[in-house]
């Protein structure tokens, strides 16, 4: 009986070690796809978000289900700013799917990193426009910034940093 449990535990660890690089590569590919799509079309397809959420199954941890709560602040902002100039539903769903992979604390840290980059870039673009005396306002996509934050936190977690 004890030999069986040791065998299955060892097999589970070996299987997880095989799945981790697969998850990492697919996660990066999907994050790049989200970024490119959001920059070019100003929308994030549901299929990419479902793909990211499905990746959480490769290294499933029940506590990561709470990560979906990382979408709540984005949902609140989206509901408050419904004039078409706020964040969109794609950003809300992206935050939730990233939270499923990263967990609640990882998802929140990824959001902080992504939003910090977003705000600093927005300020930089605004200063550039004022310096060049340009009046047009181009919307800045949030998806690429969330993707960078998620990649940073993901590899911090893989590297052993507990968040």
Residue positions per predicted region:
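A membrane-topology feature that recognizes alpha-helical transmembrane segments
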Residues: 1-163
